[in-house]
Swiss-Prot record:
Name the record gives this protein: Potassium-activated aldehyde dehydrogenase, mitochondrial
PANTHER family per the UniProt record, alphabetical: ALDEHYDE DEHYDROGENASE-RELATED
CDD domains, per the entry: ALDH_F1-2_Ald2-like
Presequence range in chain numbering: 1-24
Length: 519
């Protein structure tokens, strides 16, 4: 299926934990890859530092696996502490010499907009790389790339709109504030939306004048490395964006603890987020954390049922359920519960699961063997806890990390499948009698990332939205993102916001200036 260099060997992956590390003295900086849809491209293999692809200091590499075939795609260079050091020094020089933060803000915006245009011109290949690397359906990857393009363009428009204020302190003094960039920002992105999270991280950092050292997820580094080739073409100076591929315990730790990094942004699990928060606190670094979720999706009896079912489908099975804000806890008003279960079961069983390059596929592969095993483990936990398996719960096929859409009924609120984030296409369905009851159930969680409300009564929708503990509430829709709307969580779901003007505040600090005037 794939053409590889002689250094990229076809193997079978039993788990992501089996990623093989190898030493190559002459691994080329690009390898040719032919995609399943017939497109061909050159995949960068190096780290991206100072606007160049470079080998890692130790020449160590690791393999990248295709989740839908369990075959190796290629090897890329593995960054380590000394590579992070080189990237941080490059970013620090770029910040100190003013090549980015010292230029006209309009020029920063133009460069970011140009980067979006270059991605747009190559979006078919980029979407295909995302599907190859992550296993998600090609339709989802195309949607991701469109979101990337729109967000970069939107962010570019904020470049010349970062201002301070003049403060009237009397005739004897002139007082004002200005908002300034922080410096070098460390960014750590997940494997479920590799390129979209790359954009969510770099755009607000760059438009505010910061420089970046970014770690890709070890299982999905390809798309971020590929689009990095467009960074110099966009007019972004050397050292402004640096990409170090590698493992969390090495590269992630080095980024989090580096004294020259002033802020850390992370998307991933709550457990890892807590660790990063504690480590960053030791260096008094700013943090943005977009973490886990166990989001409620509420269906009232007056909802238009067929539309509600489709929204619930999108809420849990989109991106193979590997979404931090997935609507994995569904609550249905008692009077329509049986009818809902009937329609939701049928809709779940009709979903096309399989080859992610097939245009009719809605749910592709899980990203890794490890994640598939975790999901199947939770299916067993649900059965053992006494929940009713309504449909699914089985691996699909013998090759590739596929699982059938899975629905549990007859659940209790203290069950692990209700409380814990599964991060896959597994959903629980519970009945409720009143708005007060469902709000209490929805809020009975350590998380607070998102919620969905389905009703034809706008009063009900707005009142419930106000009382649900969630950073984002969708009404009669779900997983409905827009670059102008902020995204982030409450409680154990994180700190700070992604997207929109709100994201910019995470990358700025306020300076107050007060001058005494001559009499």
């Amino acid at each position: 299926m794939f053409s590889r260099s002689t250094l990229c060997l076809k193997t079978s992956a039993s788990s992501i934990g089996r990623l093989q590390l190898r030493y190559f003295s002459h691994l080329p900086m690009t390898v040719p890859i032919k995609l399943p849809n017939g497109l061909e491209y050159e995949q960068p293999t190096g780290l991206f530092i100072n606007n160049k692809f470079v080998p890692s200091k130790q020449n160590k590499t690791f393999e990248v696996i295709n989740p839908s075939t369990e075959e190796e795609i290629c090897h890329i260079y593995e960054g380590r502490e000394d590579d992070v050091e080189e990237a941080v020094q490059a970013a620090d020089r770029a910040f100190s010499n003013g090549s980015w933060n010292g230029i006209d803000p309009i020029d920063r915006g133009k460069a970011l907009y140009r980067l979006a245009e270059l991605i747009e011109q190559d979006k078919d290949v980029i979407a295909s790389i995302e599907t190859l690397d992550n296993g998600k359906a090609i339709s989802s990857s195309r949607g991701d790339v469109d979101l990337v393009i729109n967000y970069l363009k939107s962010s570019a428009g904020f470049a010349d709109k970062i201002d301070g204020r003049m403060i009237d302190t009397g005739r004897t003094h002139f007082s004002y504030t200005k908002r300034q960039p922080l410096g070098v920002c460390g960014q750590i992105i997940p494997w479920n939306f590799p390129l979209l999270m790359w954009a969510w991280k770099i755009a607000p950092a760059l438009v505010t004048g910061n420089t970046v050292v970014l770690k890709t997820a070890e299982s999905t580094p390809l798309s971020a490395l590929y689009v990095s080739k467009y960074i110099p073409q966009a007019g972004i100076p050397p050292g402004v964006i640096n990409i170090v591929s590698g493992f969390g315990k090495i590269v992630g730790e080095a980024i989090t603890n580096h004294p020259k990094i002033k802020k850390v942004a992370f998307t991933g699990s709550t457990a890892t987020g807590r660790h990063i928060y504690q480590s960053a606190a030791a260096g008094l670094k700013k943090v943005t954390l977009e973490l886990g979720g166990k989001s409620p999706n509420i269906v009232f009896a007056d909802a238009e049922l067929k539309k509600a079912v489709q929204n619930i489908i999108l809420g849990i099975y989109y991106n193979s359920g590997e979404v931090c804000c997935a609507g994995s806890r569904v609550y249905v008003e008692e009077s329509i519960y049986d009818k809902f279960i009937e329609e939701f079961k049928a809709a779940s069983e009709s979903i096309k699961v399989g080859d992610p390059f097939d245009e009719s596929t809605f749910q592709g592969a899980q990203t890794s063997q490890m994640q598939l095993n975790k999901i199947l483990k939770y299916v067993d936990i649900g059965k053992n806890e006494g929940a009713t398996l309504i449909t699914g719960g089985e691996r699909l096929g013998s090759k590739g990390y596929f699982i059938k859409p899975t629905v549990f009924g007859d659940v209790k609120e203290d069950m692990r499948i209700v409380k814990e984030e599964i991060f896959g296409p597994v959903v629980t369905v519970t009945k409720f009698k009143s708005a007060d009851e469902v709000i209490n159930m929805a809020n009975d969680s350590e998380y607070g990332l998102a919620a969905g409300i389905h009703t034809s009564n706008i009063n009900t929708a707005l009142k419930v939205a106000d009382r649900v503990n969630a950073g984002t509430v969708w009404i009669n829709t779900y997983n409905d993102f827009h670059h102008a709307v902020p995204f982030g969580g409450f409680n154990a779901s994180g700190l700070g916001r992604e997207m929109s003007v709100d994201a910019l505040q995470n990358y700025l600090q306020v300076k107050a200036v007060r001058a005494k005037l001559d009499e």
